[in-house]
Amino acid sequence: MINTIFCATGYGNGAKIVAVEGSFHRGLPSFNISGLANHSIQEAKHRVQSALQSAQIPLPPMRFVLNLSPADLPKSGSHFDLPIALLGAMQKEILQEEWFAFGELGLDGTLKHQEGIFPLLLEIALQRRGAKVILPKGGEEIFSPIPNLTLYFASSLQEALEILKSPPPPIERKGLEFESIEILGEKYYYTQDFDFDFSEVLGQDVAKRVALISACGMHNFILEGSPGCGKSMIAKRMRGILPPMSLEEMIECVKLQALGNQSISYSPLRPFRSPHQSASKSSILGSATSLEAKAGEIALAHRGILFFDELPHFKKDILESLREPLENNCLVISRVHSKIEYETSFLFVGAQNPCPCGNLLSSSKECRCQEREISHYRNKLSEPFWDRIDMFVQMSEKREGSVGLSSREMQEKVFEVFKIQKLRGQKNFNGKLRAKEIAQYCILESECFELIEKMQDKFGLSFRGVQKIKKVARSIADLEGSEKIKKSHLIEAFGYRKI
């Protein structure tokens, strides 16, 4: 007779569901755990035996065999105590339903609250909607808001066993109290609380236009200009105008908050990560060992914005390492005993001065840099890196002019384009479309093909460069409500290309 209770273990910036299988067999009394369980799980034998004894459910004089499946996945965490103990207690009964259980046991059978299981629960909410989960008491305030799960809380092994045999009514949960729009039967959540507003950025109409197009399609862009011209101002205001979030995306972002040791808040605001230029490569990319994986800034920016201020001051190997996540929306870290894959679908924003002193484009200050210094400064960004950037704009030094669109007005335009993309059947934003999707959704008017050939011949555009221009043109066309991409849309998109 074999029973199975499910649990989970951390894996990259997510988690893997683990089936904990248990069975009793005739033979000399023993307690064996297989399936690449680390020391914290192997030590569970002693805690579980003591907890079962305290609950007056001693293990029978038989072989107790446990298998953690998949067997080739390394597993860790004392939260496996509870499912192991429950399987030890279910000696003559067969579970009829699928259950998840998490919790560390004391020797007296009490369950101990663990905040570290929070990201695991969020991953289960994404993978197994409606799953029944038993958790230790003490975490109600943190865990209860998690959607898609039916949660039960127990203070001891005995209580958990009673829940397993006769489930009480689940706890009541409040719904998400955010503004939302509904498209094709699915809700997308947003907020209009703007900590920073685009109305505060005077002038800079071209840069604000680029920011709007970028937000519509999640296009990567770089701003160049003299110190104080408003590069960082624009980057910090991008977060407020990004597309609304689905429930699944919100869960992913809350999970990233937990992985990044941030305070937990359920919010439709997308992540905004801005590492310092002195940050190490492992803090940017993340790290992986056979026992532990730590998400870096790239992974923590998933579904949001990754902002590199003073871009050329970052180490060259870090900048080159961005090429894979910018191209494939994922990052694979391979080590001798481990291989971790992080999802990295983010909007990259870079800001840089035109030269080391910053005054090259200034009309009032003299540049103090030599030619070789400027050349070395600009060569920090390679051609393959630039090829992955959708838009580039040089900002003027003047900070005067009209107020232009506010963040609320820009957000409304972004939402209109977001709705167009969803009604068109797109699963990805315009800026994240794959080659097949570009052919399907980036439909060009007949006069555009000749223009593309001329641009390729004259400027030597790569295939990737042409695809980038098409995707930006798609967002521009959506802003104008045009079903097909027109010549004017391509010309504007090409104007933002770094040649």
Predicted features by range, described:
Residues 223, 308, 351:
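Hydrophobic anchor at the beta1->P-loop junction of P-loop NTPases
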Residues 102, 154, 301, 308-311:
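Hydrophobic residues in beta-strands of the RecA-like P-loop NTPase core, especially within AAA+ ATPase
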Residues 221-262, 328:
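Walker A/P-loop
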Residues 34-45, 60, 67-77, 290-293, ...:
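Basic, amphipathic alpha-helical bundle interface domains used for macromolecular binding and assembly
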